[in-house]
Amino acid sequence: MIHELSVLGWIKVFRHSTKNKEFFSNKQDALNKNPDKPEADLFSILDKLEDFRSSDGRFQFKLCYPEATFKSGKSCNEWIQSSNPTQSDVITDFKPVDLAFTEESYGKPWSGLGRATVGGGALIDDSPKQTHWRSAVGVFNKYYVDRFPGPLELKLQSWPRLVEMFVKKS
């Protein structure tokens, strides 16, 4: 999948695997970690997102849970938004492209990612101004043994151990 995505212009900007029970140490750590090792358990170049903003001011993202399959039969959400999720807790100009999972933390329609300002467990999530933090990216609060909060559709026992995030190179 990684090769296929890179051929199609997608750049991996984040990877978190808990196979070795590792978590980021804090929000700053989740912004940049092992920048030259995209297959590392903890990899992030989220601090470089602005480099991938398109000429029309938007980002096209893909958030993938490779070990999960949702009702759609897919494991990734693809969408466009104008807000940088590492900088803003307000998600703006959300446009779905192809959604595998469709509900955010509170059961409302999934509408992108923003910088978490409440909840205290991850850098970004799908309901950044609320206490629940699903679709979490940059988890530094070891929440459940070797797993972290994924999409609402996943129950606690099937929470993910792997998440990857990509941005489309314009």
Label for each model-derived stretch:
Residues 1-170:
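Mature extracellular or lumenal effector domains of secreted proteins
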